[in-house]
Amino acid sequence: MNKKALIVWGGWDGHEPEQVAGIFKTILEEENFDVEVANTLDVYADREKLKILDLVVPHWTMGQIEGTYVSHISEAVQSGVGLAGCHGGMCDSFRTNVDWQFMTGGNWVAHPGNDGVNYTVNIKILRANT
């Protein structure tokens, strides 16, 4: 039986949420996950569905979220559902929601050196032993 993942994308276009969600989807499918992709926060409304997932990958930047949605996803994570994300797609999702920040374990503050710093990102995929 495959593991189940949910990728939720949206918000500010600068972090290319749809494209990044597609990259995450491909990576997870190659690891034998069944992946659902949603571009609405309303998927967080179903508390019980969230709790049967193995992984949630938010990629939503600078948005607003219902308090009940944060409670639902937090409960799922507390019950053992994995949470993974990158950069501003996870920790800059909802700047004004402290509960989201506690759940993710971080908050976006600033780009070191400000914007415009050139850098290279290397993505290295390590395959799980099957």
Predicted regions and their residues:
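Aromatic-Pro/Gly-enriched surface loop or interdomain linker
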Residues: 1-53
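Short alpha-beta junction capping motif
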Residues: 4-10, 50-95
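Enriched - but not universal
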Residues: 12-15, 63, 103, 111
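A structural signal for well-ordered alpha-helical segments within the folded catalytic domains
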Residues: 18-22, 67, 71, 117, ...
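A generic structural signal for well-ordered alpha-helical segments
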Residues: 28, 76-77, 100
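Glycine-rich loops and low-complexity Gly/Arg-rich segments
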Residues: 29-34, 60-64, 80-84, 108-112
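An acidic, glycine-rich "communication" segment
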Residues: 89-130
